[in-house]
Amino acid sequence: MTKESLEKATFAGGCFWCMVKPFDTQPGIEKVVSGYTGGHTVNPTYKEVCSGTTGHTEAIQITFDPAVFPYEKLVEVYWQQTDPTDAAGQFVDRGDSYRPVIFYHNEEQKEIAEKSKAALDASGRFKKPIVTEIAKAETFYPAEEYHQDFYKKEKAHYEGYQVASGRAAFIDANWKG
């Protein structure tokens, strides 16, 4: 994997703690960073983003090798971590800072995301329409260090939150098997 061959992908799917592990464990992923994007405040803090005044959403930014794990597969993994029918947040996390968004970095990513969204909508997997936003990537601000790799640093807290938030049950009911 050379630096020149690496690309970025940015996804918002509710609490960023829950979004890192599914990508971090895939081949061809160099790093996954938790952070904030899509708003108007420069270098926001977690507290500011949670206040709902920054316009930012919690997101992850992935550095990946598309020759090993193409963007199409990243989008597929993304859908399987979210409730794509809920634009007002994800699971127990409500509000703009938890809205689901696929942020594209180029026209190819935009086209892949739009086609994937249309295919998921047409599949009939969900009774409600797919409302996940697809938007141009903006400045990404890494979150505070204690949020990075949360699933590794705070394993019990992370696993408990996956269950308590309703995310684990939703994924099992809608994406497994």
Curated annotation (Swiss-Prot):
Organism name: Listeria monocytogenes serovar 1/2a (strain ATCC BAA-679 / EGD-e)
UniProt family annotation: Belongs to the MsrA Met sulfoxide reductase family.
Gene that this polypeptide is encoded by: msrA
Superkingdom, taxonomy of origin: Bacteria
Function per UniProt: Has an important function as a repair enzyme for proteins that have been inactivated by oxidation. Catalyzes the reversible oxidation-reduction of methionine sulfoxide in proteins to methionine.
UniProt xrefs under Pfam families: PMSR
GO terms, biological process: protein modification process
EC identifiers of the protein: 1.8.4.11
Keywords recorded for this protein, A-Z: Oxidoreductase
Catalytic activity: L-methionyl-[protein] + [thioredoxin]-disulfide + H2O = L-methionyl-(S)-S-oxide-[protein] + [thioredoxin]-dithiol; [thioredoxin]-disulfide + L-methionine + H2O = L-methionine (S)-S-oxide + [thioredoxin]-dithiol
Name of the protein this chain belongs to: Peptide methionine sulfoxide reductase MsrA
Location of the active site: C15
GO molecular function ontology, one term from the record: L-methionine:thioredoxin-disulfide S-oxidoreductase activity
